[in-house]
């Protein structure tokens, strides 16, 4: 099950929707392998080249980590330079001694995004998740006016559970 959170920019009111987790219809089989009629959904969740790398690893005998509901799905990442939050698909594929996870880059500065802490046991973006590994506060960048704000500054206006 996934959850969504809506925050509004304090300046222009633009809504930012943060969707985390994964719906129950997105089974590991459908995500990582697809079925007779459809290709793997992983193709929709990852940038093309990243998907190609993951698909190659799976075809070569790699195994996705599906040990618990939080081991794959939409997660919070942040840029250590810009201090802004991003939602990206997280998964782990293991083959022999090789462990593969997606590596994303910030669209603003090009730095590698970091998985936000404290997401192991759930997907509710608590205040702890809104802080980077160094404890500094992370922020949301408004896509309309560019204002950068801390989510609790505007308050979560809606919480949505999705499946």
What residue spans do the PLM features occupy?
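His-enriched metal-coordination microenvironments in redox/metal-binding proteins
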Residues: 1-7, 17, 163
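Large eukaryotic, non-enzymatic subunits of multiprotein complexes that serve as scaffolds/tethers
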Residues: 2, 15-17, 21, 28-30
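Short cysteine-rich clusters marking metal-coordination/redox-active sites
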Residues: 9-12, 79-82, 106-109, 142-145
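Short functional micro-motifs and their immediate structural scaffolds
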Residues: 17, 84-88, 111-115, 132, ...
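Short linker/helix segments within small regulatory modules
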Residues: 24-26, 65-74, 94-101, 118-141, ...
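Mixed-charge, low-complexity intrinsically disordered segments
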Residues: 29-66
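Short, structured interface segments
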Residues: 72-96
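Disulfide-bonded cysteine-rich modules in secreted/extracellular proteins
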Residues: 101-113
């Amino acid at each position: 099950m996934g959850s969504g959170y809506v925050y509004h920019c304090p300046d222009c009111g633009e809504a930012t929707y943060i969707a985390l987790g994964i719906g129950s219809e997105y089974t590991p089989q459908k995500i990582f392998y697809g079925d007779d009629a459809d290709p793997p959904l992983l193709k929709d969740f990852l940038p093309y080249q990243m998907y190609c790398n993951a698909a190659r690893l799976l075809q070569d005998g790699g195994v996705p980590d599906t040990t618990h509901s939080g081991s794959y799905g939409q997660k919070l990442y942040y840029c250590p330079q810009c201090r802004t939050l991003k939602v990206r698909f997280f998964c782990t594929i293991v083959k022999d001694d090789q462990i593969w996870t997606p590596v994303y880059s910030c669209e603003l500065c090009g730095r590698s995004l970091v998985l936000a802490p404290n997401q192991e046991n759930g997907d509710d973006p608590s205040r702890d998740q809104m802080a980077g590994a160094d404890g500094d506060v992370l922020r949301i960048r408004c896509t309309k006016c560019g204002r950068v704000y801390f989510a609790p500054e505007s308050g979560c206006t809606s919480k949505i559970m999705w499946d």
